[in-house]
């Protein structure tokens, strides 16, 4: 049996970009936020749960750095970690997200406590970090390519939220504005790594599955939020109205 022919770099990039059809910008929960149909509680719930994603992104990037023997790659990839954690004496994306939380009426200490993080969101994010730790560095780096679609989602929030949610302090939108440029820069680097590393048909198909895995994570996070904040079915809703789910267990 002859081996399947590998896609050309242009064809492979096209296949990667086609995965954008499954990006979470199309999830009903996100569509409702974009169209102005989200309640204050739903916006706050989204911000609180996405904070768990934000604080774990540097852990994901640190895992990639730890597994990568290529100094030139590390020199460029480390900027992602600084973008979120902040350089010495400077705020990063995590502080910007805390300001977004304040802008929608959440207390920063409550965000930091992660007490509002739903189990489904926690499990999805943890799966992403664990993948980055266990996979080879090229696969972990390539899993970040949902950034191909990120500028569109950040711009959609900047375009629609000020119009639909005047109660949100506009200073909270700093994170989205900053990420517009950062995401475009990160895409160029991540895409170059991916196109260079995956040169066989089997490897390219595996990479498409890895990208789908990351898309599954983002979609599943919104599924959990939709259950809790749209359908009013948070975990254990049938037996208690208390937030009894675990708040994170340190090994």
UniProtKB/Swiss-Prot annotation:
It comes from the Bacteria. It catalyses: 6-(2-amino-2-carboxyethyl)-7,8-dioxo-1,2,3,4,7,8-hexahydroquinoline-2,4-dicarboxylate + 3 O2 = pyrroloquinoline quinone + 2 H2O2 + 2 H2O + H(+). Pathway: Cofactor biosynthesis; pyrroloquinoline quinone biosynthesis. Belongs to the PqqC family. HAMAP family: PQQ_syn_PqqC (MF_00654). Ring cyclization and eight-electron oxidation of 3a-(2-amino-2-carboxyethyl)-4,5-dioxo-4,5,6,7,8,9-hexahydroquinoline-7,9-dicarboxylic-acid to PQQ. This is Pyrroloquinoline-quinone synthase.
